[in-house]
From Swiss-Prot:
It is found in: Cytoplasm. One of its GO terms (molecular function) is translation release factor activity, codon specific. It comes from Treponema pallidum (strain Nichols). Coiled coil: none annotated. This is Peptide chain release factor 1. The keyword Acetylation does not apply. SUPFAM superfamilies: Release factor. It holds the Pfam family PCRF. The keyword Cytoplasm applies. GO terms for cellular component: cytoplasm. Keywords: Cytoplasm, Methylation, Protein biosynthesis. The modification N5-methylglutamine is found at residue 233. Its main location: cytoplasm.
Length: 351
């Protein structure tokens, strides 16, 4: 492992010189690739330096205890050795995980789709709660989000909502949110105080560029219509809503939030590209099928991945068996304590 890390250190030094060269900015694609590689190797080298420092401190402690005659001070050194050994073991595990090259999709922006499932109005209200949870998390990471399509209910919930999140390492962080999210709570409309169980489905798709997904114009049927609001009432007097149908796959995307038909079509195409890519990729990648059977769950959107129990202030992720009694904070976007174990489990499963 050390030999491999030293080779990567040489690559990192060379790459550091390249990213400081102004000529790199002449090619946007080349610049993105170099910066992505530089960011990955910088994280790796930071951990490698931490490992080497801990290893040196451990060696010094072993030498010190051999030369020490004071019994009390020897006990202090032994405790320090135990602490350093644990730190060295942790750093070694991190290095093994980081040595796995990052997924090419890791840095992608995402299209996220949230749909109310079992539970009617309560499921729709929880879909709105999840949307707020993810946008709070995005804001805490200084990511940007944009609503692409939404179907609201009269009570303020969402039958479904589609939105994008863009920023650094978005797909890498949120890819494991796909699946069924179950909620247990007393609905505000429940007079008897009984706890209801509802479900919401979340899908996370990497957002693909035009050049990455080939969608021919003749394969897309475009229909225009008037936008409708909660309950189906018409909210627009012009045909600004757009429905795109991808004829080869049957995928349908509707966008109606903008007053401009052109803007709605552009948003719909962003969603369509990601859905077509996701469908094609899931069909042809056997490797992804293996990944879905790994430690972090199947990735199947019918798989129940998480339960939110409001009376107990508890959230449980069933794939990594993480239970937190701070649901109130989680719903405000404090997701790191759930997301990090999922990412670690995924990477460790392929070591």
């Amino acid at each position: 492992m050390i030999e491999k890390l030293e080779e990567l250190r040489a690559q990192w030094r060379k790459l550091q010189q390249e990213v400081e060269n102004p000529s790199l900015f002449s090619s946007t694609q080349s610049y993105r690739e170099r910066m992505r590689d530089h960011a990955y190797l910088s994280r790796l080298m930071e951990e490698y330096d931490r490992y080497l420092l801990t290893e040196k401190q451990l060696e010094d402690a072993h030498v010190l205890i051999q030369d020490e005659s004071d019994a009390d001070f020897k006990d202090v050194i032994r405790q320090e050795i135990r602490t350093l050994e644990a730190a060295l073991h942790t750093s070694q595990k991190r290095l093994k995980t980081l040595l796995i090259p990052p997924d090419s999709l890791q840095e992608k922006n995402i299209i996220m789709e949230i749909r109310g499932g079992t539970g009617g109005d309560e499921a729709a209200l929880f879909a709105a709660d999840l949307f707020r949870m993810y946008t709070h998390y995005a804001e805490s990471k200084q990511w940007r989000y944009e609503v692409l399509a939404v179907s609201e209910t009269e009570l303020g919930g969402f039958k479904e909502i589609t939105f994008s999140i863009s920023g650094r390492d978005v797909y890498g962080s949120l890819r494991y949110e796909s699946g069924v999210h179950r909620v247990q709570r007393v609905p505000s409309t429940e007079a008897s105080g009984r706890i209801h169980t509802s479900a919401v489905t979340v899908a996370v798709l990497p957002e693909m560029e035009e050049t990455e997904v080939d969608i021919r114009a003749e394969d897309v049927r475009v229909d225009v219509m008037r936008a409708s609001g909660p309950g189906g009432q018409c909210v627009n007097t012009t045909d600004s809503a757009v429905r795109l149908t991808h004829l080869p796959t049957g995928i349908v995307v509707v966008c109606q939030d903008e007053k401009s038909q052109i803007k709605n079509k552009a948003k719909a195409m962003r969603v369509l590209r990601s859905r077509v890519y996701d469908l094609e990729e899931s069909k042809r990648q056997v490797a992804r099928a293996r990944e879905r059977k790994s430690q972090v769950g199947s990735g199947d959107r019918s798989e129940r991945i998480r339960t939110y129990n409001f009376p107990q202030n508890r959230v449980t992720d069933h794939r990594v068996r993480v239970t937190l009694y701070k649901l109130d904070a989680v719903m405000q976007g404090a997701l790191d304590d759930i997301i990090e174990p999922l990412c670690i489990a995924s990477r460790e499963s392929v070591i």
